[in-house]
Amino acid sequence: MAGITIYEFDALTACPPSAPNASGLRAVPKPVFDWLEAQALAGGTAWLRLMQKGGRRAVQALGGYAGVIRAPDGYQIEVLPKIGRATSGDQADARARQLFIRMLCCLARFRHIQTESACLKAARMPLLEVFIGEFLRAAERVVKRGLRGDYVARRGNVFALRGKLQMAAHLRRNLCQRDRFFCEFDEFSSDRPENRLLHSALRRTLSWTAWPAHQQLARELCFVFAQIPQSAQPAQDFRRTRLDRSMAHYTSALAWARLILQNESPLTGAGGHDAPSLLFPMAEIFEACVARHLKRQLAPPFTLRVQAGSHSLVRHREQGWFRLKPDLLVQQSGENRLVLDTKWKLLDNARGNSEDKYGLSQADFYQLHAYGQTYLKGQGDMALIYPKTDAFRQALPVFEFQPPGLRLWVLPFYLEHQQLILPDCGSLDCSWSRSVPFQFSPKPAPVL
């Protein structure tokens, strides 16, 4: 199946296949470009905008989203995290794809991904095929454990007496058919919502996948579900699912089926079932990734709270307005000790001048100042956490707010090693014995 791999902020234009890329533009077939342009003009697509570049009409995949865009004709646009382009080394696409899979596993609703096998597949196949492969393996495990059935109430004119004879209906229908019985009975059947959903998801993946191994496995599984009808109303069937102890092995497969049938990624394109766009907000994924690993590596007695929202910026008529919600809050015995906020942006240690300011945002500093005044009462340490790249490999010198007392650190997070890189002294404050003891290496990570 035809497709292209791009990174966040890359621009796409319609070019003849033989025309070289110009001015950083990536070429896609004209029908695909026309569809993307129509999506941007229709509005409601947070991941796409119109632009002009090099004198050509183009559409830009906005930063902050990664995943797969699938055009109605099956053409796939794979959008990888921008950090993959900001690191050196061979096989950048494969490494970026593997890193994205590992990060995606940190989201609660995607923890069913088998990380190691998915990362191995990501080195040689597009993201959509990785997702399809994970679903097929999960469905295969369900089949090996056995499809669960349930008793379903039936009514019918049958040849043998079953269940309860419905006398009125029997006399009305069978006055001249002495060999029939109109009965109401319970029949054990595999036609239940969970199986209908899996069958529908299998049929859809069979139409999506271009990988021969996936096509073969999907056909084999569809044969197992052949006697079970597909789900006519997936949303209603998902509400009817019951995952009790005997259905625990269905959990992973149904989670993938929800993603496939309802396009239930955090962001879904406007293409509907014929053109699913499975895009994921990288800011949310990065926050979840940092939170998951810091929570494991914080030394006791410190604890980590995610999205704490106990303070407001102002009070008005006895109500708190403008809730202040730092991404992460480190506490000790209920006392706030450190405020952390994650940013999915790329910094550059070499741009440390008054004009470029490393690529930092003034708005982020205002935000952290408000957090420090409310959560730390104007005294203490805060940190902004950015992804580590070749250009941003070590913590920046501390930033001090005025009046003195509130300080801000800018730290890189090494995604491949799940490691927060602290300042050279090894803690956020070399002079404080009360400093939060993160158990991480203080030295810059090696170049990838």
Tell me the role of every PLM-derived stretch.
Residues 1-40, 270-448:
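Catalytic core segments in nucleotide and nucleic-acid processing enzymes
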Residues 2-270, 275-276:
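Residue(s) in the substrate-gating loop at a strand-loop-helix junction
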